[in-house]
Curated annotation (Swiss-Prot):
Role according to the record: FliG is one of three proteins (FliG, FliN, FliM) that forms the rotor-mounted switch complex (C ring), located at the base of the basal body. This complex interacts with the CheY and CheZ chemotaxis proteins, in addition to contacting components of the motor that determine the direction of flagellar rotation.
Organism: Buchnera aphidicola subsp. Schizaphis graminum (strain Sg)
Disulphide bridges: none
Residue intervals passing through the bilayer: none
Membrane topology summary: Peripheral membrane protein
Name by which UniProt lists this protein: Flagellar motor switch protein FliG
Amino acid sequence: MTLNGTEKSAILLMSIGADQASEVLKHLTPFEVQELVASMVNINQFSNTILNTVLSECYDLFSKKNNLICNNDENYISDVLTKTLGEKQGRILLNEVLETRNVKMCIETFNHMDPEKFISLLDQEHPQILTTILMYLDKRQSSKVLSRLSEKKCTEIVLRMAEFNCIKESNLIDLKKIIENLLKRKKLIFSEKNGIKTVAEILNSMKIEDEQNILKKINVLNKNLTRKIIKEMFLFDNIVNIEDKYIQCLISNLEKEKLCIALQGTSEVIRNKFFKNMNEEEANKLSIYLEEKSYISDIAIKNEQKLILIMLKNILDNGIFSLKKLGKYYV
């Protein structure tokens, strides 16, 4: 599969996370944004091999661009070590350092993986494998993973982490092989992402002004595609990923009747998201209302759900609910 520069850039944006990708898009010209978004939407999936090739090329380009700042290529380092330690010992040390770097680069992949996917990926592995990887992960990612483990397993892993000293050099190659096999057996979350879904996630993380500017540019080129992106952005199921403090702010500014309608036919997970952010009396009343089999049209339910999503976008952008600014959130 031969990729052009735009397609490689699209894959890179799809792999670095919505927050980082949105920051990149803000610094591009309208034409560049259009080109990148079009490529992202057309890429339904890509293999781990392609992802690694793109990331490797990006790393090489960065290294070449910065070689005047830091001579860190293998030949230079090998030359220094050979002159210092001799050819044999210098090569042994360099190999050990490179193995350590390669393992850390493999582990770095997990920093961009959804915690639930990460846990699923390592579910059948020995706890020490999970412990070792968590020791080298970004601390915020490690905390997200630990918080999703069962109490028993979390305690075991934390104890192992506390007793962890370092990984033996002789075990580095084995660990690297284990990680590579894990990634081969199951798809990375990057490979599973649909182009439209990825674009929607990136736009959702932007300020409303930036989001609407990009949507307008896309709409000029492809109105049907714009509708699909907007539809993906406005998924009521995504509410389960919103922080509780924003849900509480929403509830305090939302008519209870509208919430009752919006929650008709929703899953238990979504309902519990609201129940746990209400006082017990309100939660009980809402639960009883939802158990009653009164007929409400799908259109009415969708309208109230869209209102809630618009209000949440308002709250996320402003920190509070702003009635004055509400109008600009209607797409």
